[in-house]
Amino acid sequence: MAERSDIWRLHLVYRLSHSPQGFDEDVSRRVRALESVTSVAVVPSSDASTHLAFSTRYAHAVVAAVEAKQCLQEALDAHNATLWWWQRKVRRVDESAVRKVA
């Protein structure tokens, strides 16, 4: 059983219809601002998805995972709000997920 103080490395995994310049950095900044998150980095992926690695204590893992997905949605909404109606909106191609990494 994991101790409450154990550090868990999690990946927020998402794939977008297209990736606007600076979008991943915006998501990173939002996740980094979460209270329970200790580190954030974009890690390479072998497929077309983005993997945003972040660390949090075991006791905060579920809350941090939900909040990280919310940060992604907020970044999508903020970016799309700046576009005109004829410009192509950024969409998630599939459902985002948070996974524990060894």
Give the residues covered by each predicted segment:
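Long, contiguous binding/interaction regions
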Residues: 1-53, 57-102
